[in-house]
């Protein structure tokens, strides 16, 4: 986020006493944590043993996923997950316990947007002095440790959640244009008599059970998760 977009706030200043709300955040977390744990909101699973071996975050006692977030970050992220769970239950109650395929698709993209916010609000997110913006935790494909970190202000109107949702929507719109039909058809998947029908197959690239010259595109995606872990 561009610091100049924070309204009348100056670009930087020394912290004041009233800026230190750590005690209030810790107290609020203590009240909510039992409920959130019961609802499976808190990411309290252990980080995989292969992750950074005995280097990086492990040297500083970060062994559980929730330790990757400062208390105020954790509080904000858990609130967003809680609201998402409430939205899911509301949709279920409105549809006799079921969720339509359209709602499922919309909820999926909301989770992608929320996940994007997680990437930029951790104790391993950093300030890019060149771009003058926050860099996400996976900027270096690893869980590095930072003595100081950058973060976004999620509750300011027009920033963070609004930005993340717009970014997700933009990516979805571009994918629809690439793989769409009619006037939205783009060169990636040209119409060739199949009436614009797109079939996506998922499997191992080592052995594709498909005849030669039968597909338009084969995508071999790198194992990003394994790379980071």
Regions found by a protein language model. Name each.
Residues 1-211, 227-229:
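Nucleic-acid modification enzymes, centered on SAM-dependent nucleic-acid methyltransferases
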Residues 218-219:
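Hydrophobic beta-strand segment of the Class I
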Residues 223:
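Conserved SAM-binding loop
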Residues 214-215:
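Local beta-strand N-terminus motif with an aromatic residue
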């Amino acid at each position: 986020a561009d610091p100049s977009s924070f309204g009348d706030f100056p670009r930087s200043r020394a912290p004041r006493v009233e800026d230190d709300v750590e005690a209030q955040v810790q107290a609020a977390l203590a009240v909510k944590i039992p409920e959130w744990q019961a609802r499976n909101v808190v990411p309290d699973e252990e980080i995989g043993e292969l992750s950074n071996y005995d280097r990086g975050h492990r040297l500083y006692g970060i062994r559980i996923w929730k330790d990757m977030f400062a208390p105020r970050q954790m509080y904000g992220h858990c609130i967003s997950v809680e609201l998402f769970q409430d939205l899911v239950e509301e949709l279920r109650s409105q549809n006799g316990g079921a969720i339509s395929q359209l709602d499922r698709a919309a909820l999926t993209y909301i989770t992608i947007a929320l996940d994007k916010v997680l990437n930029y609000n951790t104790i391993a997110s950093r300030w890019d002095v060149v771009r003058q913006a926050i860099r996400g935790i996976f900027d270096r494909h690893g869980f590095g440790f930072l003595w100081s970190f950058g973060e976004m202000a999620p509750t300011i109107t027009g920033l963070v959640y609004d930005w993340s949702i717009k970014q997700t929507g933009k990516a979805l719109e571009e994918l629809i244009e690439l793989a769409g039909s009619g006037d939205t058809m783009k060169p990636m998947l040209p119409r060739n008599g199949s009436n614009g029908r797109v079939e996506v197959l998922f499997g191992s690239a080592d052995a594709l059970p498909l005849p030669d010259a039968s597909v338009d595109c084969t995508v071999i995606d790198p194992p990003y998760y394994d790379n980071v872990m």
